[in-house]
Amino acid sequence: QNCQCDTTIYCCSQHGYCGNSYDYCGPGCQAGPCWDPCEGDGTLTVSDIVTQEFWDGIASQAAANCPGKSFYTRSNFLEAVSAYPGFGTKCTDEDRKREIAAYFAHVTHETGHLCYIEERDGHANNYCQESQQYPCNPNKEYFGRGPMQLSWNYNYIDAGKELHFDGLNDPDIVGRDPIISFKTSLWFWIRKGVQYVILDPNQGFGATIRIINGGQECDGHNTAQMMARVGYYQEYCAQLGVSPGNNLPC
């Protein structure tokens, strides 16, 4: 779905429909007068916050023979970020730092400090939820790949439409092309409303876990995994010199 409306007046929702309510202008809004959950105008850029030193501090904790060593690089990340100018650039400088700390907390947890490109034992899981709108290619697998471990056929298809790759027939590209791989993590972050909840002063890091893996980790299901994410978030907030805010667990 792509919005065919006047985006000077209407918001284009994450599902490609036009309107002016929270459902259209809130989390995942693609174009138009999208609602910002916060106010303020910082000046820091993503590359100001994600220094090479910050990057190396994460990547250096993974083994030297990790498949992600030459795949997950700061330059590849920054190239992907240029396709999503709204990432890490909203609200105050403190908000920007918190958003980036949250993003890398999840990336560190999902990839083992930028080590794994593909989900370990991913072949053992079936990530096909077939429908008329979202078919599956029986010869392909839709397990986790990339910094945010993109999973499920419908996410591959939707990300592919926005990022111009064939998510149905070539999901493997997310494990092959580092720029596309990073872009899928940013697609998920923004389109699924993760960015919105970390910037919303009434929510917080716990709400980001709920979107990314809430069914597996929140409400007492896997507290150790959930608290590992919280720990990384607190660590990166401390490195960036910003308070982590409230509502950290889920």
Swiss-Prot record:
InterPro entries in the cross-refs: Chitin-bd_1 (IPR001002), Chitin-binding_1_CS (IPR018371), Endochitinase-like_sf (IPR036861), Glyco_hydro_19 (IPR016283), Glyco_hydro_19_cat (IPR000726), Lysozyme-like_dom_sf (IPR023346)
SMART domains: ChtBD1
Coiled-coil region: none
Disulphide linkage map: 3-12, 5-18, 11-25, 29-34, 66-115, 128-136, 218-250
Residues covered by the Chitin-binding type-1 domain: 1-36
Gene Ontology annotations of biological process type: cell wall macromolecule catabolic process; chitin catabolic process; defense response; polysaccharide catabolic process
PTM annotation (Pyrrolidone carboxylic acid): residues: 1
Enzyme class: hydrolase
Molecular function GO labels: chitin binding; endochitinase activity
Keywords tagged on the record: Carbohydrate metabolism, Chitin degradation, Chitin-binding, Disulfide bond, Glycosidase, Hydrolase, Plant defense, Polysaccharide degradation, Pyrrolidone carboxylic acid
EC number: 3.2.1.14
Active site positions: 110 (proton donor)
Pfam families listed in its UniProt record: Glyco_hydro_19
Reported function: Defense against chitin-containing fungal pathogens.
Protein name per Swiss-Prot or TrEMBL: Acidic endochitinase
Organism: Dioscorea japonica (Japanese yam)
